[in-house]
Amino acid sequence: MFINRWLFSTNHKDIGTLYMIFGAWAGMVGTGLSILIRAELGQPGSLLGDDQIYNVVVTAHAFVMIFFMVMPIMIGGFGNWLVPLMIGAPDMAFPRMNNMSFWLLPPSFLLLLSSSMVEAGAGTGWTVYPPLAGNLAHAGASVDLTIFSLHLAGVSSILGAINFITTIINMKPPAITQYQTPLFVWSVMITAVLLLLSLPVLAAGITMLLTDRNLNTTFFDPAGGGDPILYQHLFWFFGHPEVYILILPGFGMISHIVTYYSGKKEPFGYMGMVWAMMSIGFLGFIVWAHHMFTVGMDVDTRAYFTSATMIIAIPTGVKVFSWLATLHGGNIKWSPAMLWALGFIFLFTIGGLTGIVLSNSSLDIVLHDTYYVVAHFHYVLSMGAVFAIMGGFVHWFPLFTGYTLNDTWAKIHFTIMFVGVNMTFFPQHFLGLAGMPRRYSDYPDAYTTWNTISSMGSFISLTAVILMVFIIWEALASKRVVKSIPLTSTNLEWMHGCPPPFHTFEEPAFIKSSIK
């Protein structure tokens, strides 16, 4: 029974739960790695050993957080749980493929972990640039194992993307159009399209790297007529859409949370929100070379990528101001989920502003590969994606489990996390402006003060992570059941009670639409 339910599952709720548990576990691994990084950088001098082991930790931290924490939780966990409920579908379009998408992840994770245990590990950074990732600078199996890990994670995501696109397009009730589906459903569909279009390019790039390393090809080796810059183009054509893949489902969740706790029936500017997400998805594909301003592109190319990158700020601004407009005049309930959403809006906006700074190719020449970039993307990921995940988790926890969290503990947890991440990443802007480069395990004494503060902040965040484990335990142990959830036209996922039955919408849903 246990094996049939959890190993061979074809139920979107169970698979969503598996994704959540896997993502939470991977998140702890990733947090542990980040603590190692900050412990090393907490003061000058060496802690872990040489820079190779340090860079292996940095690389693993990035891969674990991106491919095994944020994506499985947002797309696999929340996506699987909520999309069928929100559109009134009995399950996903391809339930067995859904199961395979999940079970490709543990082997992928295993390959990534084993890559750090053989030879010297893959100390390439998550970008895996040749020639550093070639078979001279990284002899041995480490990088090959990392590449295979990425292949598996990529196949998992592509299959999941196909599944979500098919589900969302084909499994809505006949009465509703795509423009009547909730914003979270939209965000997952756009994310799935981005995955489907970008991951094959990554697969091509890392497969060429694999053959360069093992089969004597020279795709990225100038000695044989190749070009390492080609790899960078292929990688970032995936890598930039990837960062939007990480944040778009968060946009969808934040829209739901802000609407719900403002006491509104619908988010402000629904069509504008949809348009903004589609624009971000499209523009995300034509700005990739802003990661490569230092490789010697000519001035016209840099001018284009600077302008195109700045244009993304417009749809992003539409979203931020629409969230603020949704709040406006509302009867605001200061629940923990609302705090996460407000924290998201504030900190994501700061991250966006530093992104606008970095989009200037001339400035980026100076700031590229400094801690300013690290601060920028951790503001949008560690405080954008993670805050959205936390907000979504505390908001939908009663739906997933049938139990309520302790409000006071949840608010304390938010406060500790908020202080921790800001103390960790705000000083890194100063380090970057002062010229401290990324991916080094040591630094001149002049950088000590801000690094020490940053490392203290990371330990505060660690206590928040540990407290969250306690909060979830407390909720599951106390078993406070949900009384009732006020239903509006925009939160139909609660319709079947908390938690919903194993099978929902076994008969096709009938939607009586009053939208003109």
Curated annotation (Swiss-Prot):
Pathway note: Energy metabolism; oxidative phosphorylation
Domain of life, per lineage: Eukaryota
Keyword Heme: yes
Mitochondrial matrix side: 1-11, 87-94, 171-182, 262-269, 328-335, 401-406, 479-516
Cross-link annotation 1'-histidyl-3'-tyrosine (His-Tyr), location: 240-244
Cofactor info, note text: Binds 2 heme A groups non-covalently per subunit.
Sites where the protein binds O2: 244
Subcellular location, record wording: Mitochondrion inner membrane
Enzyme Commission no: 7.1.1.9
Keyword terms: Calcium, Copper, Electron transport, Heme, Iron, Magnesium, Membrane, Metal-binding, Mitochondrion, Mitochondrion inner membrane, Respiratory chain, Sodium, Translocase, Transmembrane, Transmembrane helix, Transport
GO cellular component: mitochondrial inner membrane; respiratory chain complex IV
CDD domains given in the database record: Cyt_c_Oxidase_I
InterPro entries per the UniProt record, alphabetical: Cyt_c_oxase-like_su1_dom (IPR023616), Cyt_c_oxase-like_su1_sf (IPR036927), Cyt_C_Oxase_1 (IPR000883), Cyt_c_Oxase_su1_BS (IPR023615), Cyt_c_oxase_su1_dom (IPR033944)
Annotated PROSITE patterns: COX1, COX1_CUB
Membrane topology (UniProt): Multi-pass membrane protein
PANTHER family xrefs: CYTOCHROME C OXIDASE SUBUNIT 1
Protein's recorded name: Cytochrome c oxidase subunit 1
Phylogenetic classification of the source organism: Eukaryota, Metazoa, Chordata, Craniata, Vertebrata
